[in-house]
Amino acid sequence: TLVRAIIKIDSVKSKLIEPGYAYVRITQFQERTGENLAEAITKLYSGSKVPMKGLILDLRNDPGGLLNSAVAVSAAFLPSNALVVYTEGRTNDAKMQLRANPEYYLRGSGRDFLANLPQSIKTIPMVTLVNGGSASASEIVAGALQDHKRSIVMGSQTFGKGSVQTILPLSNNTAIKLTTARYFTPNGQSIQAKGITPDILDEE
């Protein structure tokens, strides 16, 4: 018999391009992406022989994933309590505001993995790379960093997946999937079907 193994793919890859300059790539937003990012940043800082001067965050071809992981990644670079994303929908329970606070990115009562990050990670110059394959959670991060003027966003127009979908059960074991809300960046820009427009357009 075959036993199905649990395969965990690390969604964060990082390296020092040269002393003081870091490159971080996020391939998708999984359950541990926020923790993986915190570990990567800590390692980059300890591995750099000079103070950190800049960081590239690569979200190209990142299809998205978990919303709380997008909030965690944004919170690593933004001031505490900064608005990351909000939703507007047809019903009151479809309206949410998600901020750069542990209550919005921690699942359960785990420790805050962002608490001990170097303070300069919130202020060093930063470039975020995006393209047409950057969707959903990666658009939330790019939009939040752009709106708060925390990072220059560079690349091509993102995919434009900013809808919240709810599955409503019907009779006869069937269900219908409805779009019940949309995601908006902190400055009120709808992501759905529009995407994030980079500050610097570069079609690769």
Spell out what each predicted region is.
Residues T1-L168:
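Cleft-lining beta-strand/loop regions that shape enzyme active-site pockets
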